[in-house]
């Protein structure tokens, strides 16, 4: 079992490399002596930094090159932030493991202000996420929301240079990079509902690679898997992709799953929210039913307008 070297395809950003090393550590802790090699790659999402993601294909741009490496045999597994994983996979590939979730909340980051509510009218807030943008605009229509691309370090540098009065990042990413001190506060799910899968690390591989799948099996975290399953089922039913104004967050309370979701107009003028509670074993069905409810209440029209503006998703 341990003779073969496991090659991990990963992006080259500091956060992506952290995630790859994290999976390497988990694998070697479960399989002492296992040899692992990282295969760092540059994706289109890392190269195209001057255009909002929604305009150039969404977050799937961050995974396509990694998937090609799996398909042509250059790598055995690919490690992803779950919030970047598209709703569909190339034939022969699939998501086989979801590791234990880190804090899924959004972080308010600012050099001079402790809270979103403290920002003066006209302040510039940076985020490229349509999900974050619509919730910010609903809560604070007096703010100026501007796109913000690049890795975490680049985004923080732009904040420190005074380009923005505040930026919104993922708590999980900042914690993983040892940058917790930059978090002014973690935004509640009521204030900023997280993205589908936010805070979780997923592992993709060839579905016919039984050897690798056996090695990965102990890394799967069942509670996280159930939560993310519900969130992704909702997103798939909405045909949501990764770069659309959709939020979804599931929590486990014993054997009961509590799923919340929203679809919002990017300008914050319309927000459709819903929730479901039910047996955790029915996570996928709950996600589908909640999506159907949102669609029936106007989400279909909101998403159609978004896709018209951003045909590459």
From Swiss-Prot:
User: What Gene Ontology cellular component terms go with this record?
Assistant: cytoplasm
Which biological processes are named by the entry's GO terms?
Answer: heme biosynthetic process; protoporphyrinogen IX biosynthetic process
Whose protein is this, by species? Yersinia pestis
Bridged cysteine pairs (disulfide):
none
Q: By what name is this protein known?
A: Porphobilinogen deaminase
Gene3D superfamilies named in the record: Periplasmic binding protein-like II, Porphobilinogen deaminase, C-terminal domain
Q: Does the keyword Transferase apply?
A: yes
Recite the UniProt keywords alphabetically: Porphyrin biosynthesis, Transferase
Query: Would I find Transferase among this entry's keywords?
Result: yes
Question: Which InterPro entries does the UniProt record give?
Answer: HemC, Porphobilin_deaminase_cofac_BS, Porphobilin_deaminase_N, Porphobilinogen_deaminase_C, Porphobilinogen_deaminase_C_sf
User: Which family does the similarity line name?
Assistant: Belongs to the HMBS family.
Reactions catalysed, semicolon-separated, are: 4 porphobilinogen + H2O = hydroxymethylbilane + 4 NH4(+)
